């Protein structure tokens, strides 16, 4: 079976730290400040993102520069999926949710963003000292991580793939129900999508979108160490 491009797998980082960050939404300068404050070393460390690179913030155009950095590895978020589907999505709804920056790009620039975003994986799996850690934007549609990987590696398509993506990109059901059942066969699943005032976990699912994209209202970027599952709080 050929591995699906919707999954990206990473071996353990033997040189430095593996960190995960919540939704970015075009606030790359503040993200860089957060990384600097915890002495992030791009020669040794890796940064994984739960997606939503753009919309809402002032620096959305910088996303392509960040995607070119060999140590930066995001999954696709629901806002990133707007870019992937820019020719067919509900443009009015997108603009209401921060997508106006994309409408101001030239057609060639839009095509470049769309091509790069379509290459983003839906899921990332990182091997750590304690075992595998998964990353999705919102939630896992199966009780086991392997269940998701098997479906994606099998090349599921059409309505079935759309249903899987809908949960991975949009679902808030678990956190709304305070469901602590977790995901089997993972040390942890790290997600964003739902803003929280501090990092929280339900079972082994870690919610780390602490609102780095609304600093005016007290939000900040949390950086989660994937080996220890310890949140690092950059200086604010």
Where are these regions (language model features)?
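Active-site-proximal beta-strand elements of phosphoester/diester hydrolases
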Residues: 18-25, 133-139, 207-208
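Active-site neighborhood of divalent metal-dependent phosphoester bond hydrolases
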Residues: 60-134, 141, 155-171
